[in-house]
Amino acid sequence: MKMSHLPFAWISDEAKCFLSRFFENISSLPVVDIRENPWILSQCIVKTGNSINNVKTLYNNLILWIYFHQTLCKKKPDYEEVWQEILKVQKILKDYLEQRQMITDYSSLTSFNKVGFETEFKNVAKDLLKLGSFLRWGTVTHAADYVNLTTEERAEIGENLQKAKNNMLSFTIYQIVDPWNENGYYVTNINRLLYLGNLLITLHGSWMNMEKLALNTINEKKNAILKAIENNKNFVSIYSYQILSLPLTSHRVTSFFKILTEDFDVITKSLELHALPVKSTWDDRVKFTPEPIQTFKVLTDLSKSSLSNQFESSSKKTSHGSSFNPEPFIKTEQRSNNTLSKDLFVGSEDGLLSSVKKDSMILDEPRNSTSINNSKKMHRILQTEILDLTDQTMHRPEDKVNQFNEIAVAPDGINQVIDTLSKLDLHNSNKVIDIVSSPKVNVVQLPKNKIDYHSTFFLPENEVNRQNGVQSRDQLSKNSTNDLQKILELRERIKTIKQNNEDIFKLPSEKRRKEIVHENLQSFDDEHNEMSLPPQDQKSIKQKNGNKANSSTKTLNMIGTNDVNASMKEKESASSAKKNQLVKDVKWTPSSSLLDLSRRNDLLQKELFESGLGEKVKKLLTDFTDTISLEERSLKDVLEPPKKTDVSNIATFNDNNLKNLLNSRKRDPLFQNFSFTEKMQPVRSPFFLPNAEIQDFDSGSLLTGKETQNTIFGASKAQENGDKDLIDLENSVQKDDDIVNKLVSHLTHSEEDVV
């Protein structure tokens, strides 16, 4: 790059030419360091009148050192000539030592590495001096640099090394010779190796020092310029500041110099603006002097009279103690509806902050009829908003203005708000209860006429209180207490019933299974007695069954009259009459057990419902019974033979039904998701059978196919001991009746306690 293209500024063309000749001939100069050439630095000085412009001079010095750094990097020699001479002499000495088997004593001379030569040269110099002392008689002192050289030769070698240090870009190798052969061939090569090593270290070290000096000077000049323009906030100064803030290393100097050359106009302009007065950072902003804000004391009494007296005294103190004149009173009727919506609902700066800034005007505002009317209207707004807090519906400001179109103007300032608060009756807590206890809808607000009042116990009373405003706080708490008492009573009854059922199933498993088998036999005989009796007997049985239903209904009705003993006697007489109708010729089927269990569950459900346990218990029992009865009815259709089938073919018919049931291809559609497994999962009852598994019952509908066959074929054998089984069956039925009596008695006493 020619010097005419270098980004120097504010200097003459003659100075630029002088600088150009300096860098062109820098290799031939005795000293390369710019600091040793003050006539070069003087060409970069920029004067404004009779004074020196420091910032512009710093910029030219920055460009000078950047270009000096680039020149050092471009003209740096590789010193290969010196290195090759070193290797040539090292080979001569190594061969000499190997011939005489002395190489082990001078291990540092075996091989040289160019990278680590500077650190290894100290050891090499010691071995060379040691070897020269061995070859040349006499001793060599440690202070000596060479072996047996004259003073003139040593001075010439030192001068040559100093020139190489001052100008590392161009050097001359000094030739050490021995024309009279005074030292010999090998001693002369030792001195040559010592000189070449010192020359290589001097050249490389001086170049590294000069490159570091140039880089450090560049950073110093750059930081000085940054400090000078950092307060300027114009565009060119900020842009120049960003460019000069780039961090620099030895490898980034070239790219940085390219950026300075491309943005020469912007950077020089920013330095020219440095002479102008610097603007403050707040000059472009609007300056304001806020008026002092008065502090108010906390009012303990919010009555009308106390407020008026306190504010009258406060306004007098403000008018006498303030240093500024209050503004004249402005009527609120002059404000438009847009200002009303903006101040009331948006909370704008004009509506809210103006009341704070103009506190003296507000306190001196007269209490005329207009302000009082506005306060009343604001009071109605607050009341309406308090009543609608349960709505949780967001309205736009325009909607609220339309909703309260009866208001012509909005209250302005703190005086109107205080007047409104003075009219609020804070001692009446009816509406406060509404705000605290009313439920909040988070997502979607339901219509008021479609709210489910049964979703919670407290909502109906609050809704009536919100709409009519008639019920008092005592009535609300009383109704809530009654509802809570009902819940506690219901939970206590359910807990007692569960405890009674747990007592039933605390018997050992074997005894319980035996009792259930007898119960199944008895239920089977009751279910199928119509198949073998004559028509007349069937009619009588139907009549007795009807009497049984009537007696059950009568029993439930007598619970309300506390006549439990009479109803239980009728139930015992009905059960004993049925026992006399047993027919031993009819075989037992496994489906009758769960049918009887379902029938007894239905009876117990009805008793519980009639005793006042509530709708939730009924729903729970109904769901459980429907679940059990669905599988029961489905199994009954498959396992139970038709009525016209001969009794002797029942066993064969059941075998075929079991095969069809186990065959997935011929399975009935009702049993697509039903399968018999060797180990059935336990089915737990939600209410009637706590801690009991259905598979404990000897029921064919819940047993595996093999167990079902064994049960069917063993039914005839069980009938041979019918008399004995009937005795055990009577004991089992008596126990069941005792359990039912306990349950009904418990429910009756619970109902009496409630009454």
Curated annotation (Swiss-Prot):
GO terms for cellular component: viral tegument. Pfam families: Herpes_UL32. InterPro entries: Herpes_UL11/UL32. Phosphorylated at multiple sites. Keywords: Phosphoprotein, Virion, Virion tegument. It is found in: Virion tegument. This is Large structural phosphoprotein. It comes from Human herpesvirus 7 (strain JI).
